[in-house]
Design a protein with these regions (language model features):
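Intrinsically disordered, low-complexity acidic/Ser/Thr/Pro-rich linker and tail segments
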Residues: 1-40, 44-64, 311-345, 492, ...
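Conserved strand-to-loop turn within each blade of WD40 beta-propeller repeats
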Residues: 51-54, 96-99, 137-141, 149, ...
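Loop/turn segments within WD40 beta-propeller blades
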Residues: 39-45, 85-90, 127-132, 178-183, ...
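WD40-repeat beta-propellers
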Residues: 57-62, 102-105, 126, 144-149, ...
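Extended, C-terminal alpha-helical/coiled-coil scaffolding tails that mediate protein-protein interactions
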Residues: 495-669
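Short C-terminal beta-strands that terminate individual repeats in beta-propeller domains
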Residues: 24-31, 69-76, 112-118, 138, ...
Length: 669
């Protein structure tokens, strides 16, 4: 038995380096952005639950044929939702996700009640025993855990510990799971190509069934009979009593990924990679129907058992009363069939999924292309879409927006959910500095300060977290100084002072290995519970920038400065210089003019100028103008634009190892 504490996973339990992610999206995502992995139907309320690869569970009214069927979204997962089961007569929903968690939901109100974190890898499958209100979960960590649903629904903030049993013995990742209604038998399918059978009451393994030649992707179980669908393209019927396969159905041309059976276990509905859905009579396998053909592989099916008559009996050729003949048999139906349903009764449309992206070289904007071939332009810093460009040439748009500017990488992009997920790691989050002017921001005092993009973004993401409003070291002093005259609230500085991100933006604190520690919306970080959980999960490198306001150091770049060979000047001592990588070429030109060229001029004119130094008479702005008029700076014999910075020169022109070398010469008159 294992005791599990539900809720947030503390930083103290981190196995990998912590990171921060956020999703750029609309406030309400009504449509499935990616594949639908699982379905559950509540016939009493005419509600369909869909679990998406966009991390969202959605609720639909299946009676709304003409009006918008969307009811609500259930959002708390951060990766693909792989499976869902309805329990307690539709009151409770259990979900399994690639974020390694199992979540318990109030299905009627649509909120997450608790989170189970026992799995160490993707959770791929769930199984439900209706008579016992027992749920099993399994995944890529090869573990199966058993959960009492009534215990899960009774969990509270103070009573947040639950006991679970585990079934060990699988040698490979588990992709499918089935349990009978009485909760006395569990069957698992895996990449081991076998079925393993357990008694959940004793946690003892009963048998191992061999026969498939590829991953077992789908299972269904009734009493002592089990059906399995595999990526090897076959459906197999197993007798648990005889511990062997008693029938093999070769209905599909490719892998079988989804199975459903009628209540009498006489007909099986199957779908998979070949996009076809068949109904096969288990007792007479020569009788089969091609129900329909989809436009994409079938990931999951749900049979509406309340339909009268059921789909399989709409054709007189299907006889539900046929009894299985004695003996084993194997069918191979190769005769082409025409689908009996050319059009679906109802279609719940999905949304476009982002399938391609390009980070522009300003390291702030992204171009994306979706499944409808629409191109969009995004601002990573402000976490928003800037413009829909429509069906335009993606590569041409990239070329149009190219700028001769180099900014270091400071974030990574993931398209797994069909939306833009931006991830910040401590190793490079603070690598990118830009000037406020270049970023399009104005400073109140008219100056042009240097801004750290990662730092600004973190401050914006946690703008509503009270701990970031006042440095705890200064809080007491501020209260003494300002409470008396009511000015404290006005003096609290929130965010970064330049921009805000949309308050609905989901922020995710997790591990580099994929495990999620905590997910919340930006606007919710001011809540008492959320604020407390942030104290436990926000990593120190984020605290440093958002709470303590400790800005990272500027990036330095070493370089050498030498006269150009065409100038005829003697080569100087090769001193290694160092400056901010954002230093503009014009500043180096000013240095050359003032400290090198002007010094030579002074030594030649001292005797005839009454000891007046030209440098003393020139204002700073005059030096800048004169430097550009008289000095050229070169790299690899290419004349440099004064507006370039050193990092751009090194990236686009120097293009080689070792320290950057710049040459100067006077312009020919």
């Amino acid at each position: 038995m294992i005791r599990v504490t539900c809720g947030v996973y503390s930083l103290l339990n981190c196995l990998y380096l912590p990171q921060v992610s956020y999703v750029i999206r609309d406030e309400v995502e009504k449509y499935n952005r990616n594949g639908v992995n699982a379905l559950q139907l509540d016939p009493a309320l005419n509600r369909l639950f869909t679990a998406g690869r966009d991390s969202i569970i959605r609720i639909w009214n299946v009676n709304q044929h003409k009006q918008d069927p969307y009811i609500a979204s259930m959002e708390h997962h951060t990766d693909w939702v792989n499976d869902i089961v309805l329990c307690c007569n539709g009151k409770t929903l259990i979900s399994a996700s690639s974020d390694t968690t199992v979540k318990v939901w109030n299905a009627h109100k649509g909120f997450c009640m608790s989170t189970l974190r026992t799995h160490k890898d993707y959770v791929k499958a769930l199984a439900y025993a209706k008579d016992k209100e027992l749920v099993a979960s399994a995944g890529l960590d090869r573990q199966i855990f058993l959960w009492d649903v009534n215990t899960l629904t009774a969990l509270t903030a103070s009573n947040n510990t639950v006991t679970t049993s585990s079934l060990s013995g699988n040698k490979d990742s588990i992709y499918s799971l089935a349990m009978n209604q009485m909760g006395t038998v569990i069957v698992s399918g895996s990449t081991e190509k076998v079925l393993r059978v357990w008694d959940p009451r004793t946690c003892q393994k009963l048998m191992k069934l061999k026969g498939h030649t590829d991953n077992v992707k789908a299972l269904t179980l009734l009493n002592a009979e089990c059906l399995s669908g595999s990526s090897d393209g076959t459906i197999r019927l197993w007798s648990l009593g005889q511990q062997r396969c008693i029938a093999t159905y070769r209905v599909h041309d490719e892998g079988v990924w989804a199975l459903q059976v009628n209540e009498g276990f006489t007909h099986v509905y199957s779908g998979g990679r070949d996009r076809k859905i068949y109904c096969t009579d288990l007792r007479n396998p020569d009788i089969r129907l091609l129900i329909c053909e989809e436009k994409a592989p079938v990931l999951k099916m749900e049979l509406d058992r309340s339909a009268d008559p059921p789909l399989a009996s709409k054709r007189t050729t299907v006889n539900p009363d046929i009894v299985l003949s004695s003996g084993d048999y194997e069918n191979d139906c190769s005769t082409p069939l025409s689908p009996i349903c050319s059009q679906p009764d109802q279609v719940i449309k999905g949304g476009a999924s982002i399938i391609q992206c390009n980070i522009l070289n300003d390291k702030r904007h992204i171009l994306t292309k979706d499944t409808n071939n629409n191109v969009a332009y995004w601002d990573v810093l402000k976490a928003c879409k800037v413009e829909d460009l429509g069906k335009v040439d993606f590569e041409e748009e990239i070329k149009k927006r190219f700028k001769m500017v180099y900014v270091p990488n400071w974030f990574s992009v993931d398209l797994k959910t069909g939306m833009l997920t931006i991830t910040l790691d401590e190793s490079d989050c603070f690598a990118a500095w830009v000037s406020a002017k270049d970023a399009g921001f104005s400073s109140p005092d008219g100056s042009d300060p240097k801004l750290n993009l990662g730092g600004l973004l973190l401050q914006a993401l946690l703008e509503f977290w009270p701990r970031t409003h006042i440095n705890p070291m200064e809080e007491e002093e501020n209260e003494v100084n300002h409470v008396a005259n009511g000015e404290q609230e006005n003096r609290i500085q929130k965010g970064n002072g330049y921009f805000q991100v949309p308050p609905h933006t989901p922020v995710i604190f997790g591990e580099a290995g994929g495990r999620t520690l905590f997910r919340l919306l930006c606007r919710d970080s001011g809540g008492e519970t959320e604020s407390m959980l942030l104290n436990e999960t926000v990593p120190q490198w984020v605290i440093d920038i958002t709470v303590d306001k400790n800005m990272p150091k500027f990036n330095k770049i070493p370089f050498y400065l030498q006269p150009h060979s065409s100038s005829g000047a003697k080569t100087l001592k090769k001193d290694r210089l160092s400056a901010s990588d954002m230093l503009q070429v014009r500043k180096v030109m000013e240095h050359v003019y003032e400290k090198i060229i002007n010094v030579d001029t002074e030594s030649q004119t001292t005797s005839s100028s009454n000891n007046e130094k030209p440098g003393e008479q020139e204002k700073e702005e005059d030096i800048a103008v004169l430097a550009e008029e008289k000095i050229e700076l070169l790299c690899q014999d290419q004349i440099l634009d004064p507006n370039m910075d050193l990092r751009t020169v090194k990236h686009f022109i120097w293009k080689s190892g070792g320290d950057l070398t710049l040459h100067y010469r006077q312009k020919s008159t």
